[in-house]
Amino acid sequence: MSKRDYYEVLGVGRDASEREIKKAYKRLAMKFHPDRNPGDKAAEASFKEVKEAYEILTDANKKAAYDQFGHAGVDPNRGGGGGYGGAGDFGDIFGDVFGDIFGGGRRGGQRQAARGSDLRYNLELSLEEAVKGLTKELRIPTLASCDVCDGSGAKKGTSATTCGTCHGQGQVQMRQGFFTVQQACPTCHGRGKIIKDPCTKCHGDGRVEKTKTLSVKIPAGVDTGDRIRLAGEGEAGEFGAPPGDLYVQVTVREHAIFVRDGNNLYCEVPISFSKAALGGEIEVPTLDGKVSLKIPAETQTGRMFRLRGKGVKSVRSHAVGDLLCKVVMETPVNLNERQKELLREFEATLTGESKKHSPKAEGFFDGVKKFFQDLNS
């Protein structure tokens, strides 16, 4: 029998937020949970279906695969028998949402030592650093495994003992009306073990505050918004649990000359009136140094020139962007009398030939003249 759409199972739209998905799961899990429906196989099947949908849609990678490929994208063992994750323990994910309720007859229940928290480091780079790549040394404040007790939390030469209240289960059960309520053990706080002689350095926590230095290779071509994941470089886990990850969030500072758009770079290059009219060669900046750019005669201000391969190498492929140079004609300033006289002489030579030498300007003023004639007619 084919599986139902996971969004349909939870009764949410495909654009539902994680909070909406969690809320829908909580409502349905309460409805179909085996402790509320003892012996009801249909309710048990519905609970498993709801749980499976929740597990997929709250995992970013699995959700992306499901959205693109459907059930085939998240089947862990195509044809391997059993649904996603098998029958599983009803307590595994249900406990994540509901905490300590509905303990019932579920096995175990001991709280596992928590994985270390992920860390985020905001790294600001210059455009040159981002384009060329480099190795950066980062100082990261974190929680590291205690080197005296090796993360156990117990004094050297001793070890944790089984909690006498919950007998190592980490949870105790209480009867409330129709339900058996399972709560974290108040003695060991859900760990199942007691540290009678805590480590003198970490005071029984198993972790200590530390600033560590990491040498991180930043690949060429990174841009603002890119994120680099360093597996296992986050905070140490509790009592030997796996560490979290470190995420380096990249921000590239604005540049005085260049503006980046993807793999392309843009810049404005000022040119003189005479260079624009007569043509010639100018030097333009690139991230690899100056290069020569040929300017054709009669170049208008705002014209864009493309220098292929002078942009940014993509961080995700071998493609290299271009440098686009916009020439901007600069009006001469601080002229002496001789220079002004020459310009007046030049202006006089254009009298009566404006259509020939300035066709756009002439056309514009003809249009303005016609506009006012039509307005007054």
Curated annotation (Swiss-Prot):
Pfam family, one: DnaJ
Name of the protein: Chaperone protein DnaJ
UniProt KW Chaperone keyword: yes
Quaternary structure, from the entry: Homodimer.
MF terms (GO), sorted A to Z: ATP binding; heat shock protein binding; unfolded protein binding; zinc ion binding
GO CC, one annotated term: cytoplasm
Gene name of the record: dnaJ
Domain notes: The J domain is necessary and sufficient to stimulate DnaK ATPase activity. Zinc center 1 plays an important role in the autonomous, DnaK-independent chaperone activity of DnaJ. Zinc center 2 is essential for interaction with DnaK and for DnaJ activity.
Subcellular location: Cytoplasm
Main location: cytoplasm
CXXCXGXG motif repeats: 146-153, 163-170, 185-192, 199-206
NCBIfam families named among the record's database cross-references: DnaJ_bact, PRK10767.1
SUPFAM superfamilies for the chain: Chaperone J-domain (SSF46565), DnaJ/Hsp40 cysteine-rich domain (SSF57938), HSP40/DnaJ peptide-binding domain (SSF49493)
Function: Participates actively in the response to hyperosmotic and heat shock by preventing the aggregation of stress-denatured proteins and by disaggregating proteins, also in an autonomous, DnaK-independent fashion. Unfolded proteins bind initially to DnaJ; upon interaction with the DnaJ-bound protein, DnaK hydrolyzes its bound ATP, resulting in the formation of a stable complex. GrpE releases ADP from DnaK; ATP binding to DnaK triggers the release of the substrate protein, thus completing the reaction cycle.
Taxonomic lineage: Bacteria, Pseudomonadati, Pseudomonadota, Gammaproteobacteria, Alteromonadales
